Amino acid sequence: MQNFTFFASCAKGIELLLKDELDALGISSSEKLAGVEFEGSFEDAYKVCIYSHLASQVMLKIATQKVTDQQALYDFISSINWLDYFDVNTAFKIIISGKHYDFNNTMFVSQKTKDAIVDQFRRETNERPNIDTDNPDNIIKLHLHKQYVNVFLCLNIESLHKRSYRQFQGQAPLKESLAAAILIKAGWLDELKKEQPILIDPMCGSGTILIEAALMAKNIAPVLLNKEFKLFNSKLHDEDLWNNLLEIAKKAQKPTNAIIQGYDIDNNVLDKADRNIYQAGVEDVVNIKRQDIRDLENELESEGLIVTNPPYGERLYGDQLDELLDIFNGFGDRLSQDFYGWKVAILTSFDESIKEMQLRTTKKNKFYNGAIETVLYQFDINEHARFKHESQLEKNIRLAEASALKSDEHIDFSNKLKKNLKNLKPWLKQSGVECYRLYDADIPTFAVAVDIYGEHVFLQEYRADATIDQNIAKQRFYQAIYQIHKTLDIQYENIHTRVRQRQKGKEQYQKNNDRNNFHVINEFNAKFYVNFDDYLDTGIFLDHRKIRQLVAKASKNKTLLNLFSYTCTASVHAALKGAKTTSVDMSNTYLEWGKNNFELNNLDIKKHNFIQADCISWLKSNSEKFDVIFLDPPTFSNSKRMDDILDIQRDHELLINLAMDSLKKDGVLYFSNNYRRFKMSQEIIAKFNCENIDKVCLSRDFLSNKNIHNCWEIKYKK
């Protein structure tokens, strides 16, 4: 059986769901923008037309070519043998999507395409096919992308989302395919595996969600409901195969014991829903009745699923907005009081209504109902559902949204983020750096540092001066959260916050909480675990990026001693270059983290040393010599594990002398610290060859903070 390339289009946001749907049909596909592509036979393509609840169009890919002018476009379309696809006595229609660098006018592209096809038929048959934009036999689609033109032949003439059952609809109709998508995303397919599946739509409108749920429950192929469905009239079409597949689909229908219940307060829309349910032939499983959502009661003994698409706020309610918000407040009450154990999914573009419910969302997914951007909010109704104990994330979101309304100072912060990102982009592209500092208190009133870790942001608030009103400082902090979310398109849950201040004693090594949220990042050829929530720092110091590279380069196939090694990131880089490493740190937690970093990079930890010890005490007793030493002590430490308090300005001379005692005569010591007022000991400068390498170690993303660290290269004098 010959294979072809097909594209199944869908609404933006449901591509992965469509891919899963095709997987269930035994068709392997790859996700693309607004659809999926798959290799297969016409039998596979027909199955998608018949069974897909989500696809809009199934298209045969005919050809793709780069074209740069109108003649090239004409020649490309002419090079396709259209007589292989349809007869001259069939009518066709051309549709254009996408954008092309050289063609601004899609009508021009359509006309050129039509001319090329018609001219070919005239040359070959002395006749021309008709153009029919209302009732074509075939649809030729051109998708434009950059300088490329992709040519498709559509298998279905009408969009697959049309099921024919919706004879009557309300003011804001929900597309059938989107209704199916939110049901799948909400977990209806899993619910159907239960002995007694239950679905309630408490604001059912004209019944689209209820009907789509019933089609899935009864295994009714959507195309069977489409009385006006029309396939392409192509020479490639296999009518016998199509009819055989339709018969198989009809026989696959089954009864169900699912309970599918709809409610609405409006008798007029309930009447429409009743007629639509009858048209769809699912009146045996779907029940509807009039009820105010604030009076919703659980009359069932087992848990189920609630899915609804309420009216979109001001668009339908206008001056009744206050009533709408009151409705949702009451809905939240009913859910938390009477639907324990249930799952709830609400599709809306009006987030104010969701806030009024006072329930914690477990998931949020963006969908499009035509051109309207909407969000599917999901909830688990349990003891944690109500806003009784507000999480830090929920608090951040609430205060961030509220702070944005109090003043417009944060606009400057937003503009600075945009400017910094624009300035850094060429460097980021050239260097391959994925984790970087975007902002570092560039605007005095927004005293925060913004570090980017892929899709996550680590936001550090510098402790406000005592003269600054703490309420104002806190408001600006939440405004910063708001603008990071809006400007950088970072999800609130991926914005991790910390207040920067001196930590004392064991605070330096203790967790903030016990979530154990580790993520993997890349730094050049190495991978590291980072944790944004559980510790005071993430597990990697971004400002040390360059000195880690220097240390690794110097340590190639040599021995490295990493003092105050933290999570052993410098050791990993060195080990990847063949170094044998010894990492010393007081914290067993960080050393274990370091071992995990080694294993993440497929490095054998048995070939490297990890020593939990006070570095000063260990250096005093050490007799081994190393080729390279990396000494990166904290500015201040008074941990009980240390014999004494460490003050880097006071103690660096002792530390360097001890480290040099463990260095080979031809070796090199890299010394770094973050004390801004640090002054190197004159005795050390006189005793050794000391070169300040601050500029060498300063990355592009830290140029605005040139005093962030002090870096020295120290060697024995020859």
Curated annotation (Swiss-Prot):
GO function term, MF aspect, one: rRNA (guanine-N7-)-methyltransferase activity
Primary location recorded for the protein, binned into one broad class: cytoplasm
Enzyme class: transferase
Keyword Cytoplasm tagged: yes
InterPro entries per UniProt: 23SrRNA_methyltr_KL, DNA_methylase_N6_adenine_CS, RlmKL-like_Mtase, RlmKL-like_Mtase_CS, RlmL_1st, SAM-dep_methyl-trfase, SAM-dependent_MTases_sf, THUMP_dom
Domain THUMP: 44-155
Keywords of the record: Cytoplasm, Methyltransferase, RNA-binding, rRNA processing, S-adenosyl-L-methionine, Transferase
GO cellular-component term (any): cytoplasm
EC number: 2.1.1.173, 2.1.1.264
CDD domains: AdoMet_MTases, THUMP_AdoMetMT
Reaction(s) catalysed (UniProt annotation): guanosine(2445) in 23S rRNA + S-adenosyl-L-methionine = N(2)-methylguanosine(2445) in 23S rRNA + S-adenosyl-L-homocysteine + H(+); guanosine(2069) in 23S rRNA + S-adenosyl-L-methionine = N(2)-methylguanosine(2069) in 23S rRNA + S-adenosyl-L-homocysteine + H(+)
Compartmental location: Cytoplasm
Role according to the record: Specifically methylates the guanine in position 2445 (m2G2445) and the guanine in position 2069 (m7G2069) of 23S rRNA.
PANTHER family: RIBOSOMAL RNA LARGE SUBUNIT METHYLTRANSFERASE K/L (PTHR47313), RIBOSOMAL RNA LARGE SUBUNIT METHYLTRANSFERASE K_L (PTHR47313:SF1)
Similarity-based family: Belongs to the methyltransferase superfamily. RlmKL family.
Protein name: Ribosomal RNA large subunit methyltransferase K/L
Gene designation: rlmL
